[in-house]
Amino acid sequence: MVIIGISGKATSGKDTVANYYSRFSKAHCTTLHFADSLKDCCQGLLIPFGTYDMSLQETKKLTIPWMGKDYTVRNLLQDVGNAFRQSITEDFWVNIMIGKIAAIKKNGSIDTILIPDVRYPNEFKMIKDLGGEVWRVER
């Protein structure tokens, strides 16, 4: 199994690269994000206050009025993500990803895992330790 991490600045095209690779490669691909579990967690926190579709880029720009005038969904994602990393373990989200990758490997039907939101050194290290490679997208 091939693991390809994709890094780059915000809106540099990381997901676009993953989508093209998945679409035009002959490999059976799946795309995972380190932020998937974080978004699920934050979505659950926000359910009582309305519907926030975390899969949409525009959602990150929405303000959460009861959290303060300028507090956005992006701020919530950053704060919650960092809180888990700082309070529990720096590898909190990495460990979740390792579990997801192990489940996919066990299933055996996927050739390539694409991870288009590699940001932190421990995320790079995890991919390298699992025999993968990391691509950098420049715009």
Please give the residue ranges for each predicted region.
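Extreme N-terminal starter segment of soluble prokaryotic enzymes
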Residues: 1-4
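The Walker A (P-loop) glycine that initiates the GxxxxGKT/S ATP-binding motif of P-loop NTPases
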Residues: 8
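ATP-binding Walker
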Residues: 11-12
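Walker A/P-loop
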Residues: 15
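Post-Walker A helix-loop "phosphate-sensing" segment adjacent to the P-loop in P-loop NTPases
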Residues: 22-31
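ATP-dependent NMP and nucleoside kinases share a basic, alpha-helical "lid"
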Residues: 28, 96-139
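ATP-dependent small-molecule kinase phosphotransfer cores
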Residues: 36-110
